[in-house]
Amino acid sequence: MNIKETNPSGGCHVVILGAGASIAATIRDPEIHGLQLPSMNNLPDVIGLHGCLNHFPAELIQDNFEATYSNIAEHDPGNPYLKVMNDLIYSYFDSMELPLKPTIYDYLIMSLRDKDVIATFNWDPFLYQAWWRNALHGSSPQLLFLHGNVAVGYNQEHNLIGRAGMYSKDRSIYFEPTKLLYPVKHKNYASDSYIRKAWDILQNRLDKDTCNTHNVTIFGYSAPVSDVEAMGLMKKAWGSVDDRNLEQFEIIDIRTEEEVTYSWRDFIHTHHYDYRKSFFESSLALYPRRSDEAFFCHFLPLTPEEAFVESNPVPQDFQTFEEMWEWYQPLIDKESQK
């Protein structure tokens, strides 16, 4: 029995993305303008912030931009060069575009359904661009931008998101660009209405009392000790690991298994985790659009066929969107037959 033969069910899959996911999405085919995706260690070099940083005391400047920014924001929050840096960062990320070929983000969008959620800490527009260009092909997952995003706008009055700086089709609703939550040491996730809403939804999906989430995938997010508030909010929703014996925690990361399991030790129930170094080794790529069904076949099978269900790995070498959409279409068709 192949997983694609199972009847679609409704359990939620939560995917949480960090910078490593966006980097992975542009390895095979780089960003269309040749722009480099910066990390917190090289962001001043890539974006060109040293002219601004030179206006601050040398003792505030650290190797990691997150530490530098936190020091500056605490030392001199009203300094005009802080706003200049904010504007330069926003402008750089806003100019980035995915290549015009299927990327890992396109696979990710197509491998989930509208019952699922992708939450990202990234500022770059790649995830939203992938969602937008695949939106007409099957139901798509809900997107949550936990630190804001250059591509996403929000209308608070109507509680709707759309493309930043754009209007709805009837031009009655304007989507105000979301604010980027810059890397201060103590982030206030309640300070912005959109970011607060995104966190509320994520916490709801992680809470076993409010949602039937069986699969959580962490992709390229290092669980930094500096982001105490983020980890605290997720841990509060997840609860005690002793109570999460029916969930599977999956980590896609190039770090060692020992490193990543230690980082996420407060979320992993004993052996209930999978460690992968590539997206294509993950449940998302092995059981696209059917990861929840695969979970039940493996852990709570009703028949011998379910216990030995075969995977349906998505091909890794699509060169056109048409090829990719054609491959996913039988899975989408079966969903409409429920």
Where are these regions (language model features)?
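Gly/serine-rich nucleotide phosphate-binding loop at the start of the catalytic core
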Residues: 1-127, 146, 327, 337
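Secondary-structure boundary elements
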Residues: 110-117, 133-139, 209-212, 220
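Residues at the C-termini of beta-strands that transition into short coil/loop
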Residues: 122, 147-150, 253-255, 290
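Active-site gating loop/helix substructures
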Residues: 70, 75-99, 130-208
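SIR2/sirtuin-family catalytic core signature
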Residues: 1-17, 21-25, 204-338
